[in-house]
Amino acid sequence: MQQTHESALPGFLGMLDSAISRIESFLLAMGVLLMAANTVANVVGRFVLGNSIFFSEELNRILIILITFAGISYAARNARHIRMSAVYDLLPARLRKGMMVVISVVTAAFMFLLCYYAAKYIGSQASRGRVLPALQIPVWVILIWVPAGFFMTGAQYLLTAVRNLTSSGIYLSTHVQEGYEDAEEIEI
């Protein structure tokens, strides 16, 4: 699948959509590559040089958090989240479109609420002054990705609602239209 950062949304919303797409792609690519390099370097260090990298596990933990929460936004952008669509699929197109707007707005609201609670949690962690044992980084710093991921995911769902309100088709995300890519998927 070729990744494009262009948006079908007009004006500022299109720029926001494109910016989020670029951020997601960069964070995911950087996170996966750094995790692979760190793991390989740790294995080589352990078996060839006889010493592990002392901060390897902590770095991978940070990268897992980054990849997870950048990944939820990426999945929303590409309409790859699990959907319970048994009732939805039976509805006529007009009702499906309205339902998609409601689903997108409600999901965005929950994502923004989770962003708020994650930010509050980070505040409580910051006040405790805990640090990672090996890297000596404050614990709250590695959790920054949690509200950032929830915020980007909420923005994706909000932009999906806007896309459905401003376009004639039914969109599962800002650029993924409802339907089957392959006619064979319809056969049972």
Curated annotation (Swiss-Prot):
Pfam families the record matches: DctQ
Gene: uehB
InterPro entries: DctQ (IPR055348), TRAP_DctQ (IPR007387)
Alphabetically ordered keywords of this record: Cell inner membrane, Cell membrane, Membrane, Transmembrane, Transmembrane helix, Transport
GO MF annotation, one: transmembrane transporter activity
Main location: membrane
Membrane topology: Multi-pass membrane protein
Localization per record: Cell inner membrane
One Gene Ontology term from the biological process aspect of the record: C4-dicarboxylate transport
Quaternary assembly: The complex comprises the extracytoplasmic solute receptor protein UehA, and the two transmembrane proteins UehB and UehC.
Name used for this protein in its record: Ectoine/5-hydroxyectoine TRAP transporter small permease protein UehB
GO CC terms of this entry: plasma membrane
Function: Part of the tripartite ATP-independent periplasmic (TRAP) transport system UehABC, which imports both ectoine and 5-hydroxyectoine as nutrients, and not as osmoprotectants.
Additional free-text comment from the UniProt record: Transport is enhanced in cells that are grown in the presence of ectoine, but not by high-salinity media.
Transmembrane portions of the chain: 25-45, 52-72, 99-119, 131-151
Family in the record: Belongs to the TRAP transporter small permease family.
